Amino acid sequence: MTGLASPALSERKVLLAIREGYLDPRLLAAARNLCQRLGAGLDILLAFQGKQLPAEVADLVKTLRDEGVAYRISQFDQLRRRDVVQYANTHECIATVVIDSLEGWERIARSRSSNPWANLACPLVTAVPPKQVKERT
């Protein structure tokens, strides 16, 4: 799903990675605020099994449209650290990556001892303080 924006918007983008069960309002707010500050669009990597967007993401999309912010949503069955890093590093326009927390990503990692975040070519923002992240069902 892609949204159009005003032509004045730069090619810079914020990458927002959303894992199913870890959707926190602070995550969406952090990504939106960074887009505003940087004058950037938003690429969203969404790990979600349903056919309809989660209500919080749908609300974010509506806000982005209303504000004229370009966005793109890519949906996945699962999302690993490596996937986020690879996407960010292969898209030159990504200025920063926003995730909920560093915690919990190892659960589906092939190698739990590796640290793909160390290979990220741009800043990584965690929106939820450690120890406050819990999987929601």
Language model segments and positions:
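Structural motif
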Residues: A17-G21, A47-Q49, Q75-F76, I99-E103, ...
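A glycine-rich helix N-cap at a beta->alpha junction
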Residues: D59-Q78
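Short, well-structured alpha-helical segments in soluble
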Residues: V61, V84-E92
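Short acidic active-site motifs
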Residues: E56, L79-V85, R112
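Small/aliphatic-rich secondary-structure junction motif
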Residues: G3-A58, R65-E67
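Gly/Ser-rich helix-loop-strand patches that form or flank binding pockets
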Residues: N89-T137
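SAM-dependent methyltransferases
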Residues: M1-E11, P129-T137
